[in-house]
């Protein structure tokens, strides 16, 4: 029977530690970490994510603000809003909730965020720092996965890691973080032939494709560690991941559940990176 990797419990523990660090920072340096979340339009899923981030920021003791903007806002107007917070020393983290409306160029918006305040880790400068082995701001989901692997003492050096999904948000940065730990990494995608056969060689399998229960027991080798990034609903409307949990858990050594695995750690790492940005602001 697999060990269930409890991301929710780890997130709670890290959040408690963060509250203590924020209190000390406030007492010693008179600085409160500040996070602004910019929301364009009224996407229901995005609204849920934004509320969760706002709740986590307040719980951590941050100065938190959500800016709600009309879906019809122009690209230039949105950049002006971002620049306002780039210049505001009370805010150490700026997050623009994605996706954006079709008339707005996403990359242009990401480029407008000060890289020092880019707590999502999507700015090309932060991406470059990650690939050069000098990461500061790292996409939060891969960062959270690394914390889970560390918490459960998963050895990565010399191990074979396979990632399903090559997005800029999860797959690609995840590959680099694993390479930094001296794993041998294969990044797969929808055009990868014999996908199950490739995945079956993995000591560590990370799945991020957004297809409910896609990964079955034939994808995993005996004793593998499986990290499920997906959040979907099955035919009965119940939350599930990209991995068929009930089928796979009998074969692997460790696995993250959905919900309660990777998800809670993503928001926790966003808060941690905002705190770290506040610390770096002391150095100018």
From Swiss-Prot:
List ligand-binding residues for NADP(+). 165-167, 190, 231
Keywords (alphabetical) are:
Amino-acid biosynthesis, Histidine biosynthesis, Hydrolase, Methionine biosynthesis, Multifunctional enzyme, NADP, One-carbon metabolism, Oxidoreductase, Purine biosynthesis
Q: Which Pfam families match?
A: THF_DHG_CYH (PF00763), THF_DHG_CYH_C (PF02882)
InterPro entries attached to this UniProt entry? Aminoacid_DH-like_N_sf, NAD(P)-bd_dom_sf, THF_DH/CycHdrlase, THF_DH/CycHdrlase_cat_dom, THF_DH/CycHdrlase_CS, THF_DH/CycHdrlase_NAD-bd_dom
- Does Nucleotide-binding appear among the keywords? no
Catalysis performed (reactions)? (6R)-5,10-methylene-5,6,7,8-tetrahydrofolate + NADP(+) = (6R)-5,10-methenyltetrahydrofolate + NADPH; (6R)-5,10-methenyltetrahydrofolate + H2O = (6R)-10-formyltetrahydrofolate + H(+)
Q: In which pathway does it act?
A: One-carbon metabolism; tetrahydrofolate interconversion
The EC number(s) attached to this protein equal: 1.5.1.5, 3.5.4.9
**Gene3D superfamilies membership:** Leucine Dehydrogenase, chain A, domain 1, NAD(P)-binding Rossmann-like Domain
Gene Ontology terms for molecular function: methenyltetrahydrofolate cyclohydrolase activity; methylenetetrahydrofolate dehydrogenase (NADP+) activity
What GO terms describe the biological role, i.e. biological process, of this protein? L-histidine biosynthetic process; methionine biosynthetic process; purine nucleotide biosynthetic process; tetrahydrofolate interconversion
Q: Which PROSITE patterns match?
A: THF_DHG_CYH_1, THF_DHG_CYH_2
GO cellular component terms given for this protein: cytosol
Asked whether the keyword Amino-acid biosynthesis is assigned, the reply is yes
Q: Which family does the UniProt entry place this protein in?
A: Belongs to the tetrahydrofolate dehydrogenase/cyclohydrolase family.
How this chain assembles, per its entry, is: Homodimer.
What exactly does this protein do?
A: Catalyzes the oxidation of 5,10-methylenetetrahydrofolate to 5,10-methenyltetrahydrofolate and then the hydrolysis of 5,10-methenyltetrahydrofolate to 10-formyltetrahydrofolate.
Protein's name in the database: Bifunctional protein FolD
From what organism does this protein derive?
Answer: Streptococcus thermophilus
Identify the gene encoding this protein: folD
């Amino acid at each position: 029977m697999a060990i269930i990797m409890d991301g929710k419990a780890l997130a709670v523990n890290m959040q408690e530690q963060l509250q203590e660090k924020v209190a000390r920072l406030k007492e010693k340096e008179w600085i409160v970490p500040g996070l602004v979340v910019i929301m364009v339009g009224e996407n229901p899923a995005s609204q849920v994510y934004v509320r969760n981030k706002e709740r986590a920021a307040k719980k951590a003791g941050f100065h938190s603000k959500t800016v709600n903007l009309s879906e019809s806002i122009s690209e230039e107007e949105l950049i002006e809003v971002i620049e306002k917070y780039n210049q505001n020393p009370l805010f150490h983290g700026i997050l623009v909730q994605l996706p954006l409306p079709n008339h707005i160029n996403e990359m242009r918006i990401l480029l407008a965020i000060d890289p020092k305040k880019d707590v999502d880790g999507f700015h090309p400068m932060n991406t470059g720092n990650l690939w050069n082995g000098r990461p500061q701001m790292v996409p939060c989901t891969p960062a959270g996965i690394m914390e889970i692997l560390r918490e459960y003492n998963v050895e990565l050096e010399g191990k074979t890691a396979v990632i399903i999904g090559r997005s800029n948000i999860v797959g690609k940065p995840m590959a680099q973080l694993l390479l930094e730990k001296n794993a041998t990494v294969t990044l797969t995608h929808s055009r990868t032939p014999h996908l199950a056969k490739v995945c079956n060689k993995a000591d560590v399998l990370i799945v991020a494709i957004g297809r409910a229960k896609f990964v079955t027991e034939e994808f995993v080798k005996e004793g593998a560690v499986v990290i499920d990034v997906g959040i979907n609903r099955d035919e009965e409307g119940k939350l599930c991941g990209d991995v068929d949990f009930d089928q796979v858990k009998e074969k692997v050594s460790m696995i993250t559940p959905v919900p309660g695995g990777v998800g809670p750690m993503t928001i926790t790492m966003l808060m941690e990176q905002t705190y770290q940005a506040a610390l770096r602001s002391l150095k100018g």
